[in-house]
A protein has these predicted regions:
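Non-catalytic helical/linker scaffolds that mediate oligomerization, partner binding
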Residues: 1-470
Length: 470
């Protein structure tokens, strides 16, 4: 079975039950809703549709809400756009005006107070580059370093700067509460720069923080520099290479990607590699060779999940994109020696759950087991076993439907919903039967079972047992 999970962004190209069904069958594990676009009414229709489809197929499809996050944008031009030449003078202002070829308003009222002479302003995915030459009251006077066409409402970025805009906007607050009300499984938090950003999100979530997992989107230098602190407050990260590639030199992206994947894997945090993975499939039925290698390299690095954005949201071939990504991942995984990696990687073993999870994976390799069955209420033990990237298939057993869905994003895990067990004997019997039914085991095949003896108590992992079919 494929170990690397696939996240798909839902948009006009796939927002119908037939296409969503085909995408799930092709390999979609998590459906992502981008709240930078659309209304709550539109998103509710999509969520209800996803719930109907997953119920019909009886699959643990998880739903991810991706927040808009703190954004900095220019406002509108009188004629919709202007063309700026290299060397032109141009002004950004916090005054509310209609833009022209000399000046345009910005959305953040405190911008002039926070920028300095010599700072860089990038627009339109860094295609347009401005240098601040002076600041006069509300006006930020710039020189155009790299010109081009600039149109309404383009986003702005400021490499090397951390601005003081409030992290959780009213829009994000409303979206988060909407997601809680409609039972989303993950919230992806945009432009996370420090752990306080996540604490602010958790304050909005209240008690729901224990039911919805937080994914920190790493999109700027500050987020990269603060990754250790950020990982203490999140359940995983997304390497959002689009905005990250604007903020930092593009030649550093592959190095940062590999470092972040390795860090999260060792910490037991899920890690998503995202942006432009199969970008050409927005228009073409097949990927480029470079895109194929990009997906494969993320899989080689051990990413938990790979993500499709415009390919499924707005592309001509959403189902084909999912199928292509799944086939690349599976073929790559066949050529990775996970047993050797397990033996040579130095893991941090900090507590009994870590130790038992590590021992479980080692025992499964030594005994040539076919399946590791992990029984977990919250999914924590399953995620800890997953982080060791075992060559043996992992079956994540849980009585909780929410956990069942969230395990869909854990590397190497096949989520299985089970009934409550009353004793270890019942647990072992259920694990064996579920493994036989799920993986087609035969007489003589071994299963390693791990979990906790106390029914219904999270974080009580304290046993390992070897079961043999037959």
């Amino acid at each position: 079975m494929r170990k690397t999970k696939i996240i798909c962004t839902i948009g006009p190209a796939c927002r119908n039950e037939e296409t969503l069904t085909d995408m799930i069958r092709a390999g979609m594990n998590v459906a992502r809703l981008n709240f930078s676009h659309g209304t709550h009414t539109e998103h509710l229709e999509t969520i209800d549709m996803l719930k109907r489809v997953r119920e019909k197929l009886n699959v643990p499809l998880a739903i991810m809400l991706d927040t808009k996050g703190p954004e900095y944008r220019i406002r509108s031009f009188e004629n919709g756009s202007v063309f700026l030449n290299d060397g032109d003078d141009f002004t950004f202002t916090t005054d509310q005006i209609v833009g022209n070829e000399h000046k345009v308003s910005v959305s953040y009222p405190g911008l002039a107070d926070e920028l300095s002479v010599g700072d860089t302003i990038l627009l339109n995915n860094a295609l347009l580059n401005f240098e601040v030459v002076s600041i006069d009251g509300h006006d930020i006077n710039c020189r155009v370093v790299s010109g081009g066409e600039l149109s309404n409402n383009k986003s702005m970025s400021f490499p090397g700067k951390t601005l003081k805009q409030k992290y959780v906007s009213e829009q994000d607050r409303s979206d988060i509460l909407f997601g809680i009300e409609n039972d989303v499984d993950f919230i992806a938090c945009s432009f996370v720069s420090c752990k306080q950003d996540l604490l602010d999100i958790k304050a909005v979530m209240g008690d729901s923080v224990n039911r919805i997992d937080l994914i920190a989107k790493i999109e700027n230098r500050t987020g990269i520099d603060n990754i250790d602190d950020i990982c203490t407050e999140c359940d995983g990260i997304m390497i959002a290479r689009g905005d990250m590639g604007v903020e930092i030199p593009f030649v550093e992206l592959p190095i940062i990607q590999k470092a972040l994947i390795t860090k999260c894997r060792l910490l037991g945090k899920r890690v998503i590699t995202a942006t432009e993975m199969l970008e050409s499939m927005i228009h073409n039925p097949r990927p480029t060779r470079a895109e194929t290698s990009d997906v494969a390299n993320a899989v080689y690095d051990g990413t938990s999940a790979i993500m499709l954005s415009g390919e499924t949201a707005a592309g001509k071939y959403p189902v084909e994109a999912v199928d292509t990504m799944a086939r690349i991942a599976m073929q790559t995984e066949k050529n990775i020696n996970y047993t050797k990696r397990f033996g040579t990687t130095e893991f941090r073993i900090k507590n009994p759950v870590d130790a038992i999870s590590h021992a479980t994976c080692g025992m499964a390799i030594d005994l040539n087991a076919k399946v590791i069955a992990v029984c977990s209420l919250s999914g924590m033990t399953v995620r800890m076993v997953s982080r060791f990237r075992s060559p043996v298939d992992i079956m994540g057993m849980t009585v909780d439907k929410k956990t069942w869905r969230k395990l869909s994003m854990s590397w190497g895990v096949t989520p299985v919903l089970c009934e409550t067990y009353e004793s270890t004997d019942v647990l072992f019997y259920a694990a064996k039967n579920k493994a036989i039914a799920t993986f087609g085991l035969e007489s003589g095949d071994r299963i390693i079972v791990t979990g906790g003896m106390t029914n219904g108590v999270s974080g009580n992992t304290n046993l390992i047992k070897v079961e043999t079919v037959g």
